[in-house]
A protein has these predicted regions:
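Conserved D-loop-proximal element of ABC-family nucleotide-binding domains
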Residues: 92-93, 105-113
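Flexible glycine-/small-residue-rich
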Residues: 38-42, 58-62, 85-87, 148-149, ...
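C-terminal lobe/lid and adjacent interdomain/linker elements of RecA-like ASCE P-loop ATPase modules
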Residues: 110-170
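Charged, surface-exposed helical/loop "interaction arms" that form contiguous linear patches used
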Residues: 1-45
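GG-anchored amphipathic helix commonly corresponding to the ABC/SMC/Rad50 NBD signature/C-loop
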Residues: 60-63, 76-98, 122
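Walker B catalytic acidic pair
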Residues: 101-102
């Protein structure tokens, strides 16, 4: 129980810094009124990961109350939250690779370009795989791969190939 108590206190301190940093990161991504808080609630019984239940509370609007992310955030808001959270984790952990699978869902234009900047910056420290349909994100990449499906007589096969310079411009 002593270790669980120490972990709980560390979570409380870290959660405040995390919330503050996340808000600073997400404001330039077109969410100027974002409020974010990590609620750390005691469990009745300790478990292997400690004695806390953790909830991410969020609002993108000035007048809206903070609610659990899953209940209130749109697809585009979740995309931006996930990008910021992954970028923060990557800043504290020596990850060799980070994968973004359509993290740009629900965004476009200038916001997508700014999200691409974040991924490009991460790419200076680690390998970044970004699955995207947006040119603003793809343009930031060093290498591009084309993923496609091909039908054979018996089944459909997914294939991948590296794109050459001319294909990247299309």
């Amino acid at each position: 129980l002593q270790q669980a108590s120490v972990l709980s206190e560390q979570r409380k301190v870290a959660s405040m810094a995390m919330a503050s940093q996340l808000v600073k990161m997400i404001i330039p991504l077109g969410m100027p009124n974002t409020r974010f808080r990590v609620d750390i609630l005691p469990r009745k019984e300790p478990e292997s990961d400690g004695m806390d239940d953790i909830r991410f509370m969020f609002s993108a609007n000035k007048s809206a109350e903070l609610q659990p992310v899953a209940q209130t955030a749109s697809g585009g808001e979740i995309s931006r939250l996930m990008l910021c959270i992954k970028a923060m984790i990557a800043g504290f952990t020596a990850l060799p690779t980070v994968i973004f699978d359509e993290v740009d869902t629900g965004v476009s234009g200038d916001i997508a370009d700014k999200m691409g900047d974040i991924m490009q910056e991460l790419g200076t420290k680690m390998q970044v795989f970004a699955i995207t349909h947006l040119p603003q994100i793809a343009a930031k990449g060093k290498d591009h791969y084309f993923v496609y499906k091909e039908d054979t007589d018996e089944r459909t096969v997914t294939r991948i190939r590296k794109m050459n310079k001319e294909e990247r411009v299309k």
